[in-house]
Amino acid sequence: MRVVVVGAAGQLGRELVRVLPPAETVGLVRDDLDLHDTGAIAPTLAALAPDVVVNASAENRVDAAEDDATDAVAVNAVAVAAMARACRGLGALFVHVSTDYVFDGRAGRPYTEDDAPNPESAYARTKLAGELLARSLAPRHAVVRVAGLYAHGGSRGKGGSFIDRILAQAREGRPLRVVNDQITAPTWARDVAETLARLLPRLRAGQAPSGLYHVTNSGACSWYEFARTALELAGVRAEVGAVSTGELGARAPRPAYSVLANARLAALGEPALRPWRAALEAYLAA
């Protein structure tokens, strides 16, 4: 099973390339495929003759998209449509990675794959558009929603992962202020990658249906609790100030509660991903 990972320099992309069989995996970074050049997408993928294409790329500068969504639309929607069409032509499975931000956060309980999305930011609207395009244009597909993703090296667009930034600021003695009114399920990208490594062959063989899949570590916490736990586990002493989302003055709205329930994974008999604290501890030890 030949797998092409688009966005192989990103948090999840790097982990996918790490866990998938090297002889059967091709990772594409921006120098290999610029997603703003939609005309290059189909021929690039066709030349690689994939059985599966995983789109782990995203334009995820959430606040910047409120001012100008051009890049977000191009990468999160237009390029997704081009990849989905290419996969349809190749008879390949298309796996597209999306986000918990497609929900408005008002449910007050974990969202399942059956819950209706209601994105409130420009970024989130482009991500939902990508989901809909992937599902409508690629007959064989899986849209995988993740939440609070982190990995070693982090997101280049955000200056590293949340954990990397928190630990660096604490060690430098800089003040830490973290929101305490956004509840999510922080998720180590490696755990998502290992789950997908098991799921891809089942999807490819038709043993798992096309559709939506939530893939996150279990449990829930605020970003404030997550930061304090990271410092505790890393043995770094620092004061963390709890602030509200409103106090931070972010331009884009964020869901107050965006915990995802991995209902469809459970229905397939897939093991639950470990609790977020256990994943964080393993991440810090890796």
In which residue ranges do the predicted regions lie?
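Mid/C-terminal beta-alpha module of Rossmann-like enzyme folds, strongest
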Residues: 195, 202-252
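C-terminal amphipathic/interface module of NAD(P)-dependent oxidoreductases
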Residues: 229, 255-286
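Adenosine-cofactor binding site in Rossmann-like domains, unifying the SAM/SAH pocket
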Residues: 21-43
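Catalytic helix-loop patch of NAD(P)-dependent Rossmann-fold dehydrogenases
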Residues: 67, 74, 79-82, 102-144, ...
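SDR active-site strand-loop-helix element
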Residues: 6, 28, 56-57, 94-99, ...
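N-terminal Rossmann NAD(P)H-binding glycine-rich loop of SDR-like oxidoreductase domains
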Residues: 1-20
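NAD(P)H-binding glycine-rich loop region in Rossmannoid oxidoreductase-like domains
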Residues: 35-77
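NAD(P)-dependent short-chain dehydrogenase/reductase
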Residues: 135-184, 190-198
